Design a protein with these regions (language model features):
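Short, structured patches in soluble enzyme cores that scaffold and shape functional sites
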Residues: 10-12, 68, 134
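Short hydrophobic/aromatic beta-strand micro-patches
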Residues: 9, 65-67, 106
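Flexible, gly/pro- and Lys/Arg-enriched active-site loops
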Residues: 48-60, 70-140
Length: 140
């Protein structure tokens, strides 16, 4: 399979936030047949849609563009494994997270499956995704 462009959003609101982003970038780049092709700047953002008790925990966000020979489902599984390896726990909906890795786009394909919807259904509503896309001159 020829390499495809995968756009991934990284976010962390548990310290050390910058370290979690760096480790996620390293782990993504270490996936088989995958390399980083571009990165946005890192930006601090307010949380969106979180419970009030977590509203003070600002995020560091970054968009990563990768080239990968992996299939979309394998890529997605590996992303979730990276989240788990970096201590992501999903006990509270929209709660604090060491790392959040979202697949925004994968080679322009459209999927609507229970565990994977592409392109990301809320990407265009989120400034922390749209601003870095504009910074890198990428359109969804």
């Amino acid at each position: 399979m020829p390499p495809v462009r995968a756009i991934v959003s990284l976010g962390s609101n548990i310290e050390p936030r910058a370290e979690y982003l760096a480790k996620a970038r390293e782990a993504l780049a270490a996936m088989p047949e995958t390399r980083i092709a571009g990165m946005s700047s890192v930006e601090e953002t307010d949380p969106v849609g979180v419970p009030d008790e977590f509203a003070h925990l600002k995020f560091l966000n970054q968009l990563i563009v990768l080239q990968t020979g992996l299939g979309v489902h394998d890529f997605s599984r590996r992303m979730h494994a990276i989240e788990s390896a970096l201590g992501r726990v999903r006990t509270v909906r929209n709660g604090p997270r060491t790392i959040d890795i979202d697949l925004i786009d994968f080679g322009g394909i459209r999927l609507d499956e229970p565990d994977l919807v592409l392109p990301h259904p809320r990407a265009k509503e989120r400034d922390f995704i749209m601003k870095p896309l504009a910074e890198m001159a990428i359109e969804l």
